[in-house]
Regions:
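Glycine-rich flexible loops
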Residues: 1-169
Length: 169
């Protein structure tokens, strides 16, 4: 008999790469992700960002002060770890700095989507641990990092150290 994790691993292996994006480029995929997030109520401008790790060591990201429903492929910018814009209009959100720490800690991570869904934000303010109470949440069971203390805006290296350490392997 297979263990539960073995079943989960097998399912995700079979499901990987089943979506056909045709000839869509990375910027188009970022823009589509933003539109999907916006359609689900994630209308971030300052407190949410997406980054994608590129093979050349640079990153695609959404610019500061643009809501997810405003992002199109032309507004996606390419940056380096020094937050310098290498391609595209706009300024990177300083909060993406913590993404670099995660990418260094976890070579398997290729994309980070950081949002503040209203319901999740509300639940987090209760100070109570979240409980897996529905079968749709079971893939996250024992695979979530929880931070008891938070130093504030994630714009410095301290936040990246805390987050990447909490994620572990």
């Amino acid at each position: 008999m297979l263990e539960k994790q073995d079943h989960a691993d097998a399912f995700f292996a079979r499901s990987a790469n089943k979506l056909d994006f045709g000839n869509w480029g990375e910027k188009e995929k970022v823009a589509l992700s933003c539109r999907i997030l916006a359609s689900e109520g994630h209308s971030e401008t300052l407190a949410g960002q997406i980054t994608v790790r590129k093979e050349d060591g640079t990153f695609l990201t959404t610019p500061l002060a643009q809501a997810f429903d405003e992002i199109d492929p032309a507004s996606v910018i390419r940056i380096n770890e020094d937050m310098e814009v290498l391609e595209g209009p706009g300024t990177p959100n300083p909060a993406v700095r913590f993404h670099f720490w995660v990418y260094r800690q976890r070579p398997d991570v290729q994309c980070i989507i950081h949002t503040h869904p209203p319901h999740v934000s509300t639940l987090s303010m209760t100070g109570q641990p979240l409980v897996v109470a529905h079968m749709d949440a079971t893939p996250f069971h024992n695979d979530c990092a929880h931070l008891k203390e938070w130093p504030g805006l994630p714009i410095a290296d301290q936040e990246g150290e805390i987050i990447s350490a909490a994620l572990g392997d």
